[in-house]
Amino acid sequence: MMLNEMNKSLEGVDIRINEPLKKYTYTKVGGPADFLAFPRNRYELARIVKFANQNNLPWMVLGNASNLIVRDGGIRGFVIMFDKLNAVTVDGYVIEAEAGSNLIETTKVAQYHSLTGFEFACGIPGSIGGAVFMNAGAYGGEISHILISAQVLTRDGEIKTIEARDMRFGYRHSVLQDNQEVVVSAKFSLKPGDYTIISQEMQRLNHLRALKQPLEHPSCGSVFKRPLGHFAGQLIMEAQLMGHRIGGVEVSTKHAGFMVNVANGSAKNYEDLIADVIHRVKENSGVTLEPEVRIIGEKEVQMEDS
């Protein structure tokens, strides 16, 4: 009955039923979404949220799925992906990007227009929406340094503007994590620069990233937040956990702050390995690591042997 109603209310919207999320995540793990939706514009997005709210169905936006782990039991209700909301425009020294825009590609737009300030993000996988939500950063730069404002979707399906000063930015944190609002688009203030110098800096940062990070395997990016006065990777190395493996997921031998899916690992492998590393590092150094990666969805129901 509800499927008929959904087909009528959301006619023309790209919706996939019982769709495995591991097809879309950087980790290559994750169970099915009841309904996976790809809105083409804000009008379709509003229709999806309105339908979900009216039918008491949970909904969430799954950005670019780069810095998160979806559990093997999947996600109930609607999962919304912004892949088709990806327009980027340049007006003077301001770049406006829709939430589904690829972060790395957006830094290339800035480079093409000789605008400086976005170089730090040139190798960070993910979407603009996720980058604002997490206050993504690297090599001394972060989104909070350049954001002007963001248009966000409230849980009621309304769109409003939040100025950068009201984002309550912190280390890998924004107010959006507290109120569960979702970025629809964001404006960034950049400065005029020299194309060659910008290009050289982006090349340098990408070279550093390739040297230090395990880009050859699926991963969820940096797993842990930087603990005060320490480096997570260093603490993990000191606990002799490089190469430590559970199932198909292991602590990278290239950078201990990363976990890589080397042999068809599961979300449970990731979760168990994260918990084990936290426990062992605490035992070894007394420092409690805090995950930077988000873990969402339901655990897989294990069938008991009769």
UniProtKB/Swiss-Prot annotation:
<dbReference type="InterPro" id="IPR016167">
    <property type="entry name" value="FAD-bd_PCMH_sub1"/>
</dbReference>
<dbReference type="InterPro" id="IPR036318">
    <property type="entry name" value="FAD-bd_PCMH-like_sf"/>
</dbReference>
<comment type="function">
    <text>Cell wall formation.</text>
</comment>
<comment type="pathway">
    <text>Cell wall biogenesis; peptidoglycan biosynthesis.</text>
</comment>
<feature type="active site">
    <location>
        <position position="292"/>
    </location>
</feature>
<dbReference type="Pfam" id="PF01565">
    <property type="entry name" value="FAD_binding_4"/>
</dbReference>
<keyword id="KW-0132">Cell division</keyword>
<protein>
    <recommendedName>
        <fullName>UDP-N-acetylenolpyruvoylglucosamine reductase</fullName>
        <ecNumber>1.3.1.98</ecNumber>
    </recommendedName>
</protein>
<dbReference type="GO" id="GO:0051301">
    <property type="term" value="P:cell division"/>
</dbReference>
<dbReference type="GO" id="GO:0009252">
    <property type="term" value="P:peptidoglycan biosynthetic process"/>
</dbReference>
<dbReference type="GO" id="GO:0071949">
    <property type="term" value="F:FAD binding"/>
</dbReference>
<dbReference type="GO" id="GO:0005829">
    <property type="term" value="C:cytosol"/>
</dbReference>
<dbReference type="GO" id="GO:0071555">
    <property type="term" value="P:cell wall organization"/>
</dbReference>
<feature type="active site">
    <location>
        <position position="172"/>
    </location>
</feature>
<keyword id="KW-0963">Cytoplasm</keyword>
<dbReference type="InterPro" id="IPR011601">
    <property type="entry name" value="MurB_C"/>
</dbReference>
<keyword id="KW-0573">Peptidoglycan synthesis</keyword>
<dbReference type="InterPro" id="IPR016166">
    <property type="entry name" value="FAD-bd_PCMH"/>
</dbReference>
<keyword id="KW-0521">NADP</keyword>
<keyword id="KW-0131">Cell cycle</keyword>
<dbReference type="InterPro" id="IPR003170">
    <property type="entry name" value="MurB"/>
</dbReference>
<keyword id="KW-0133">Cell shape</keyword>
<dbReference type="Pfam" id="PF02873">
    <property type="entry name" value="MurB_C"/>
</dbReference>
<comment type="similarity">
    <text>Belongs to the MurB family.</text>
</comment>
<dbReference type="InterPro" id="IPR036635">
    <property type="entry name" value="MurB_C_sf"/>
</dbReference>
<keyword id="KW-0285">Flavoprotein</keyword>
<keyword id="KW-0274">FAD</keyword>
<dbReference type="InterPro" id="IPR016169">
    <property type="entry name" value="FAD-bd_PCMH_sub2"/>
</dbReference>
<dbReference type="GO" id="GO:0008360">
    <property type="term" value="P:regulation of cell shape"/>
</dbReference>
<dbReference type="GO" id="GO:0008762">
    <property type="term" value="F:UDP-N-acetylmuramate dehydrogenase activity"/>
</dbReference>
<feature type="active site" description="Proton donor">
    <location>
        <position position="222"/>
    </location>
</feature>
<keyword id="KW-0560">Oxidoreductase</keyword>
<keyword id="KW-0961">Cell wall biogenesis/degradation</keyword>
<dbReference type="InterPro" id="IPR006094">
    <property type="entry name" value="Oxid_FAD_bind_N"/>
</dbReference>
<feature type="domain" description="FAD-binding PCMH-type">
    <location>
        <begin position="28"/>
        <end position="193"/>
    </location>
</feature>
